Amino acid sequence: MKEDKENTRPREKKVEIKCDENDKQEKPCKEKKEAMTKIVIRRLPPTLTKEDLEEQLQPLPELDYLEFFSSDTSLFPHLFARAYLNFKNQDDIVLFRDRFDGYVFIDNRGQEYPAIVEFAPFQKVAKKRSKKKDAKSGTIDDDADYKKFLEFYNGDEEKSPSNPEILLEEIEAKTKELSSKKTTPLLDFLKNKQRIREEKKEERRRREIERKRLREEERRKWREEDRRKRKEAEKLKKVEKAFEKDKDQHKDEQPKIKLLRKPEKADDGETEKPKDKPKKQDRERQKEDRPSGGDLKKRQNGEHREEKGGKPEDVGHKEYRDRDGERERDRDRERERRQKEKERIRRQDEERRRRREHQDGENNYRKREEEGKKDKERVWEKRKNEHTGESSGSARPEKSSRDSKKEESARKDRLRNKDRPAIQLYQPGSRNRTRGGGGGGGTGGDGPAAEKRAEREAKKNQEKAAE
């Protein structure tokens, strides 16, 4: 469609001119025809100049108008230049279109830009106005007003005083005039604003100083309070040290009490009733601390006499008595604590002793069982040798018994602490075993249960030997 439009001849515009009845008689109406002669070349390279365009369009037909417009950066990415041409002869338009429509322009970077040639939407062309020279240009020296100005200017320079005092007076007068001038509302507003800003700054600075002063005051009070607390703590420590010294002196003065226990009592009774002992000890202590009747009477009589003697001394005596009472209570507590500690240590020793005995009993029982097994094996081997009359058969068990003895001795030598079985704290029926093992003498397993076990093991050994 675009090519058809370009190839077709442009339409001619018909303009009708209306004439009045009077003009009709004088001038007949004429139809004026306007032909389209102005074209536009679009999509030119953005770096192209007017001189380069004219150079590339040569040879150009007769033109009366050529205007070039460079690319507009605000229309990115559509950065193209364009040119407008107005031909004098309408026939040259078709030839120009055939030549440059689709013509590829190349810029300095080597990029290709195919151009488009079409009629300009606005066909009017700016008229060329002849610039007339101004008649008054270069005639200022002859102007009367300019001459008057020069005379006035040169006369002031001649009249200017050379005395510096007069100059200073004139300058001061001028400054006074300037200062006496009224200020404008805008200047007043600015001055007022500056004044308010300075006042706020001063207020802020004053507040900051006050805050710092209060902070320093609080720190000083805190330091004083801390110092006072330290002094009080040191005083309390000194008092406590003095009290502890008195306490130690009283402890040294008091005789040490040793508790004797009956060895006939069983260990089970001690473990089952540990709570009854402290009560009995407390009762014994109360009996010891309780004074006799004569002492009570003497104390009461003495107290009555002191009350009769004088009241001001009672306060000091009461304080001294309270202190003595506190010291005695502290001593009693310390004594109880030591006694409990001794009792705990004694219980631990008993428990360790019992465990050791239990372990020793188990070890003895195992040794006896092993010795019994060995004896039975020897007896069984002897019987076997008696039944079998062959010398070779009798030699083999002897060798096996010797080998087993060597292995046992080597195993005993190899047995170390880490290879021994772990000690069991509690085994049910271990006490009965120890009692039964203790009365048997050297043979150990004489009971029926031990004999059965020995028989079973002997049978197993026989089966192994047969295999």
From Swiss-Prot:
<comment type="function">
    <text>Involved in nonsense-mediated decay (NMD) of mRNAs containing premature stop codons by associating with the nuclear exon junction complex (EJC) and serving as link between the EJC core and NMD machinery. Recruits UPF2 at the cytoplasmic side of the nuclear envelope and the subsequent formation of an UPF1-UPF2-UPF3 surveillance complex (including UPF1 bound to release factors at the stalled ribosome) is believed to activate NMD. In cooperation with UPF2 stimulates both ATPase and RNA helicase activities of UPF1. Binds spliced mRNA upstream of exon-exon junctions.</text>
</comment>
<dbReference type="InterPro" id="IPR035979">
    <property type="entry name" value="RBD_domain_sf"/>
</dbReference>
<dbReference type="GO" id="GO:0045727">
    <property type="term" value="P:positive regulation of translation"/>
</dbReference>
<dbReference type="GO" id="GO:0003729">
    <property type="term" value="F:mRNA binding"/>
</dbReference>
<feature type="compositionally biased region" description="Basic and acidic residues">
    <location>
        <begin position="197"/>
        <end position="389"/>
    </location>
</feature>
<feature type="region of interest" description="Disordered">
    <location>
        <begin position="197"/>
        <end position="467"/>
    </location>
</feature>
<dbReference type="GO" id="GO:0005737">
    <property type="term" value="C:cytoplasm"/>
</dbReference>
<keyword id="KW-0866">Nonsense-mediated mRNA decay</keyword>
<dbReference type="InterPro" id="IPR034979">
    <property type="entry name" value="UPF3B_RRM-like"/>
</dbReference>
<dbReference type="GO" id="GO:0000184">
    <property type="term" value="P:nuclear-transcribed mRNA catabolic process, nonsense-mediated decay"/>
</dbReference>
<dbReference type="GO" id="GO:0005730">
    <property type="term" value="C:nucleolus"/>
</dbReference>
<feature type="compositionally biased region" description="Basic and acidic residues">
    <location>
        <begin position="449"/>
        <end position="467"/>
    </location>
</feature>
<keyword id="KW-0539">Nucleus</keyword>
<dbReference type="Pfam" id="PF03467">
    <property type="entry name" value="Smg4_UPF3"/>
</dbReference>
<feature type="region of interest" description="Disordered">
    <location>
        <begin position="1"/>
        <end position="30"/>
    </location>
</feature>
<dbReference type="InterPro" id="IPR012677">
    <property type="entry name" value="Nucleotide-bd_a/b_plait_sf"/>
</dbReference>
<feature type="compositionally biased region" description="Gly residues">
    <location>
        <begin position="435"/>
        <end position="447"/>
    </location>
</feature>
<keyword id="KW-0694">RNA-binding</keyword>
<dbReference type="InterPro" id="IPR005120">
    <property type="entry name" value="UPF3_dom"/>
</dbReference>
<protein>
    <recommendedName>
        <fullName>Regulator of nonsense transcripts 3B</fullName>
    </recommendedName>
</protein>
<comment type="similarity">
    <text>Belongs to the RENT3 family.</text>
</comment>
<feature type="compositionally biased region" description="Basic and acidic residues">
    <location>
        <begin position="396"/>
        <end position="421"/>
    </location>
</feature>
<keyword id="KW-0963">Cytoplasm</keyword>
<dbReference type="InterPro" id="IPR039722">
    <property type="entry name" value="Upf3"/>
</dbReference>
<keyword id="KW-0488">Methylation</keyword>
